[in-house]
């Protein structure tokens, strides 16, 4: 019997896919990339037409040896990495590293990890798409060139540990520009005026809002203007001058793309972008469903397409007709996108089986998995449903030369809203008293309610709104939104307070240097155009090295000028009262990928470091020890350092402080029960994920 090897990226996929295939199939994981540019050097032969110098990633030797051994025993090797540029490149690197015979090597892809999808992919194998690979190679070299050439300059001129990046630096500038807008904002005064009007025969008054004159909307700019209007209204009669009844519809939303999922999960579930992607990855790769084993319950999570397969569309319409009735099924086919940036034939993010309702598998999912799956399921189901229909009434009420308005809207047919309502959807106005009004009705004024307001500055970016802006501007791609935001947070270029993102001092310094010395790198249009060029490489329209040839010389010249002309910027470390037990110096606060830590200023002579523990003046009621404040990432780092069998409980009510959301934890936590933390009022059980129980 012939033997086949299927290589995927992650061990989680191995478990899911194994059960779909027979005993003559071996499924193994590469565990991500196996080759990359070396970390210790540029890794690009500039003198040899920018040829990349790939090496085996440290720690991947044993994995490759095992795969090589298995490949030799197999009649055919199927490379089943993710269906995008990165996945295509991993397959290409695997083929090279394993020295696979082209005759026995085939590439397969699937948008969902289900039995039907995997079986179908095996019936339609193909060659590796070198246009996709070349687009990834171009992106990798561009990113390496920017990071490798500019980051050392930041170390020399500002401080070590800083970095620049082709996408991260533009994202930082977007946040910095918004901060500048907020700082420069000058509030302007304006006033609103509500009138409480009594309808004859009714006990409760209705609230009418000042509009202006019958034909022109007015803005009231000052108290003086308001006083003048109130004086004129003093003895005026309030009479209905116009009533308009109309119908309107609200279309169902499109199914999720990566960016819209990240945005809505942030609004509805309070998930950060990284958390959303981590949980979506779990749902895609497979979860244990009682009675069904490991099942991939959503389609591929990195996509900018709203397209839905004909099979999924038909299944959804059938389910909706059976569950909600034929009247709820949308007409025609929805969700084709004309966006030229769409990288491939991916579908939107959807459940792999619409009949697998959230309620049906709730007991098989963690709380976070359930909430995200429910969001995806509802959004997809709603996208195949009829619009919601509203009956609206708008009334104009005249008072002398002025006009007030009152309106109401009633849902006539709920349509898709029977399943899904967006987190920030506007509340429909509801004023039942409007139904008691008719033309020329006279109302009695009970009181006026004038209020002073001031225009508000632009809102600070949140993770959700930053993702939305990046997508709208063409900055980055579905796979890069979350890592980019995580990176500039980790570098402390921005901080997160509540949901809002704020520019830090070090972020401002780095952004100013980038704008001064590398204006094109942080230019939104330049970066968007570069993404467009990468798309053209993927489409086979532009050779990938042509993109590099047109980029690198200008970058190298800009670096040389900056090295000569850029002045050093000194940023002092914050000194603490904690004494270094090694040398007696006062330790300083440093920032790492997961937040603050204490370091000796005597580095490199003294390399002492320790965790940064913020005292909050609260003792543990069980053991009497002091409770400290730490970030989730700091906690996870410490959990990972424990022995595998350790059982830990972290009792963690949220503290909201200047530096973001933290949790209280017991310093002596390992003596407690199991791994559990509470963030934003939500309990997270980490024991499975970190294998500590």
Residue ranges: model-predicted function:
Residues 1-137, 211-214, 220-223, 227, ...:
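Intrinsically disordered, low-complexity regulatory segments
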Residues 2, 506, 522, 613-693:
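Conserved phosphate-binding elements of NTP-dependent enzyme cores
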Residues 2-5, 16, 25, 151, ...:
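Basic, low-complexity terminal or inter-domain segments flanking catalytic cores
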Residues 113, 117-195, 245-246:
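C-terminal or mid-to-C-terminal helical accessory/interaction module adjacent to the motor/catalytic core
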Residues 139-150, 167, 195-197, 248-260, ...:
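Core structural elements
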Residues 215-254, 441:
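Metal- or metallocofactor-binding catalytic centers and their adjacent structured scaffolds
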Residues 260-272, 467-477:
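Short helix-coil junctions and helix-kink-helix linkers
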Residues 277-281, 485-486, 666:
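Short, hydrophobic-biased segments on the C-terminal half of alpha helices
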């Amino acid at each position: 019997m012939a033997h086949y090897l299927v290589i995927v990226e992650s061990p989680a996929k191995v478990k899911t896919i194994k059960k779909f295939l027979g005993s003559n199939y071996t499924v193994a994981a590469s565990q991500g990339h196996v080759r990359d540019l070396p970390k210790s050097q540029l890794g690009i032969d500039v003198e040899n037409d920018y040829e990349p110098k790939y090496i085996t990633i440290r720690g991947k030797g044993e994995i490759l040896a095992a795969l090589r051994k298995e490949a030799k025993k197999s009649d055919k090797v199927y490379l089943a990495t993710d269906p995008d540029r990165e996945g295509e490149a991993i397959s290409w690197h695997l083929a090279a590293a394993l020295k696979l015979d082209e005759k026995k090597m085939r590439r397969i892809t699937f948008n969902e990890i289900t039995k039907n999808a995997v079986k179908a992919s095996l019936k339609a194998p193909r060659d590796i798409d070198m246009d996709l690979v070349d687009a990834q190679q171009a992106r990798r070299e561009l990113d390496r060139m920017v990071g490798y050439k500019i980051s050392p300059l930041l170390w020399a001129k500002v401080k070590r540990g800083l970095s620049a990046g082709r996408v991260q630096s533009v994202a930082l500038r977007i946040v910095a520009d918004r901060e500048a807008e907020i700082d420069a904002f000058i509030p302007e005064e304006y006033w609103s005026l509500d009138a409480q009007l009594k309808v004859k025969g009714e006990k409760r008054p209705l609230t009418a809002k000042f509009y202006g004159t019958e034909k022109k909307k007015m803005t009231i700019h000052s108290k003086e203007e308001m006083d003048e209007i109130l004086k004129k209204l003093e003895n005026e009669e309030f009479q209905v001058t116009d009533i308009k009844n109309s119908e309107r519809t609200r279309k169902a939303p499109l199914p999720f793309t990566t960016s819209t999922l990240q945005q809505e999960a942030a609004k509805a579930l309070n998930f950060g972008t990284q958390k959303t992607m981590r949980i979506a990855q779990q749902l895609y790769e497979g979860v244990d469903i009682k009675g069904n084993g490991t099942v991939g319950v959503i389609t591929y999570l990195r996509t900018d397409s709203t397209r839905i397969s004909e099979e999924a569309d038909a299944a959804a319409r059938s389910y909706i007709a059976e569950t909600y009735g034929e009247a709820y099924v949308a007409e025609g086919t929805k969700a084709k996108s004309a966006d030229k940036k769409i990288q491939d034939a991916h579908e939107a993010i959807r459940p792999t089986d619409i009949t697998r309702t959230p309620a049906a598998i709730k007991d098989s999912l963690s709380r976070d998995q359930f909430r995200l799956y429910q969001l995806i399921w509802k959004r997809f189901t709603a996208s195949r449903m009829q619009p919601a229909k509203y009956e609206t009434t708008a009334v104009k009420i005249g008072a002398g030369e002025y006009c007030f308005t009152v309106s109401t809207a009633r849902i006539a047919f709920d349509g898709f809203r029977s399943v899904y309502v967006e987190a920030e959807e506007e509340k429909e106005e509801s004023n039942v008293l409007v139904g008691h009004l008719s033309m020329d009705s006279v109302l009695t004024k009970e009181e006026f309610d004038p209020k002073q307001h001031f225009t508000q500055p632009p809102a600070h970016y949140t993770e959700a709104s930053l993702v939305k802006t990046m997508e709208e501007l063409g900055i980055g791609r579905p796979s890069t939104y979350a890592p980019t935001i995580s990176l500039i947070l980790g570098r402390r270029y921005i901080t997160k307070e509540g949901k809002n993102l704020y520019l830090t001092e070090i972020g401002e310094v780095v952004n100013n240097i980038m704008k001064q010395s590398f204006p094109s790198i942080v230019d939104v249009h330049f970066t968007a155009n570069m993404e467009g060029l990468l798309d053209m490489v993927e489409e086979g329209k532009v050779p990938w090295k042509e993109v590099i040839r047109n980029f690198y010389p200008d970058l190298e010249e800009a670096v040389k000028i900056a090295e000569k002309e850029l002045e050093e910027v000194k940023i002092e470390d914050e000194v603490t009262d904690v004494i270094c037990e090694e040398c007696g110096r006062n330790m300083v606060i440093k920032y790492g990928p997961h937040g603050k830590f204490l370091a000796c200023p005597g580095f490199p002579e003294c390399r002492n470091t320790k965790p940064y523990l913020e005292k909050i003046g609260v003792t543990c009621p069980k053991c009497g020890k002091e409770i400290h404040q730490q970030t989730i990432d700091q906690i996870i780092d410490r959990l990972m350092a424990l022995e595998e069998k350790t059982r830990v409980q972290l009792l963690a009510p949220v503290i909201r402080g200047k530096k973001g959301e933290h949790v209280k934890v017991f310093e002596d936590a390992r003596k407690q029960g199991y791994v559990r933390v509470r963030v934003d009022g939500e309990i997270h059980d980490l024991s499975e994920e970190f294998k500590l129980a």
